[in-house]
Design a protein with these regions (language model features):
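Alpha-helix N-cap/helix-start capping motif
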Residues: 80-84, 107, 144
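A charged, well-structured terminal subsegment
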Residues: 136-153
Length: 176
């Protein structure tokens, strides 16, 4: 029986995601300030808080929209565990539903494909594969676009053909 991860990468609906935050730890008060989802057609979703720190009601209104843009695709992000930690923390704190998605982390993929890279920060691995960012890094849209470029360069370098080859996994978290 074929696994859902046997699907060719070129035919998968990929959603490249990034968040920007006020800090590193949501449990110590850091909050989401920007969220973006990009696909092969461009920016699907882009939100930036107009308040510092972001208001709970704004984040509560935006998280379901973010998840809706991820539900029908394979989520791809760089150091995705960081973003997932913030999304799950905020969703739990605000009483929102959980998520059930398949994902690929380009950080792990870069460590596999570029085994001798000196740094695995997004800008460094982008440069290591000979690519430049389309937009400014350290913005949600800029990093999501850079992740898309990085992903396809890693796929090419690694000779990867399927979701399984790229290390796709399933993430299930149920809120409320």
């Amino acid at each position: 029986m074929a696994s859902r991860f046997d699907r060719p990468l070129r035919t998968a609906s990929l959603r490249f995601v990034d968040l920007e935050t006020t800090g590193l730890r949501p449990d110590r008060g850091a909050r989401i300030t920007e969220m973006a989802v990009v696909d092969e057609g461009g920016v699907r979703y882009d939100w930036t808080s107009s308040h510092d720190p972001p208001r709970d009601e704004a984040v509560a209104a935006q998280l379901p929209q973010l998840v809706a843009h991820l539900d029908d695709g394979i989520v791809v992000g760089h150091n995705l565990s960081f973003d997932v930690r913030f999304v799950t923390y905020e969703a739990e704190r605000l009483g929102l539903d959980g998520i059930d998605v398949c994902f690929i982390d380009t950080l792990g993929l870069a460590r596999r494909v570029l085994a001798r890279a000196g740094s695995y920060r997004l800008g460094a691995v982008l440069a290591a594969v000979g690519a430049a960012p389309e937009e400014e890094l350290h913005t949600a849209v800029g990093d999501a676009l850079a992740t898309r470029t990085l992903f396809w360069r890693l796929v090419e370098r690694g000779g990867l053909g399927t979701l399984a080859d790229a290390g796709a996994k399933r993430l299930r978290w149920h809120g409320r």
